[in-house]
């Protein structure tokens, strides 16, 4: 049996879709309380990590208007969140993945407008 063919080249449309998801998420943080739990927060900020991983594959020209959209979404996220004492995935995961507050800042922030369930779960993050 032949092995499957290697994946094709990355598609900038996939990156644009991730940026659209990130922009929608960040715009919501500014207008309403974050009403979900820690698992959802992790999923939401993981989108930004996927964007970081894809960015080196495309120029700002290839990204088109989405380059500016990403910049604006990042600013919106920063304005609607606060520094968190640890990586929201925990120190062990941050160490293993080599995530830092400088490079992977989305993993070291939590919503300003939160909820009690999320805050209780964040209190257990080590």
Put a short name on every predicted segment.
Residues 3-54, 62, 66-119, 126:
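Long, compositionally biased low-complexity segments enriched in polar/charged residues
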């Amino acid at each position: 049996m032949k092995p499957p063919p290697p994946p094709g080249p990355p598609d900038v449309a996939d990156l644009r879709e991730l940026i659209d998801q990130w922009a929608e998420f960040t715009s919501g943080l500014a207008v309403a309380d974050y009403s979900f739990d820690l698992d959802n927060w992790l999923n939401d900020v993981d989108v930004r990590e996927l964007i970081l991983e894809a960015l080196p594959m495309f120029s700002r020209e290839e990204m088109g208007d989405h380059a500016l959209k990403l910049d604006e979404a990042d600013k919106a996220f920063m304005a609607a969140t606060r520094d968190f004492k640890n990586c929201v995935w925990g120190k062990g995961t941050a160490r293993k993945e080599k995530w830092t507050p400088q490079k992977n800042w989305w993993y070291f922030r939590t919503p300003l407008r939160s909820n009690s369930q999320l805050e209780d779960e964040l209190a257990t993050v080590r």
